[in-house]
């Protein structure tokens, strides 16, 4: 159960500074993009990779995220809100946590 709670906590927080990797995407060239999130908008993550800055849409993607010593998979549709709105809606995310795996 603790893993699910950490997943919900992750969904409801700002992602800037987290390490992420795109593991599923309708755009096959995005799969494998890995780096640190340097900016976040409602619909995109800006990821600094070894090859430079990449902008990846959230919707329709699945991300591997390194958070508090754990690796989690998060569906981008669950975080497709402005970061400040996700934080305000933290309790609502409990109901949507079906997309969180450890």
Curated annotation (Swiss-Prot):
Keywords: Cytoplasm, Endonuclease, Hydrolase, Nuclease, tRNA processing. The keyword Kinase does not apply. It is an enzyme of class 3 (hydrolase). Its main location: cytoplasm. One of its GO terms (cellular component) is ribonuclease P complex. Pfam families: RNase_P-MRP_p29. Its EC number is 3.1.26.5. It is found in: Cytoplasm. GO terms for molecular function: ribonuclease P activity; ribonuclease P RNA binding. Belongs to the eukaryotic/archaeal RNase P protein component 1 family. Part of ribonuclease P, a protein complex that generates mature tRNA molecules by cleaving their 5'-ends. This is Ribonuclease P protein component 1. It comes from Archaeoglobus fulgidus (strain ATCC 49558 / DSM 4304 / JCM 9628 / NBRC 100126 / VC-16).
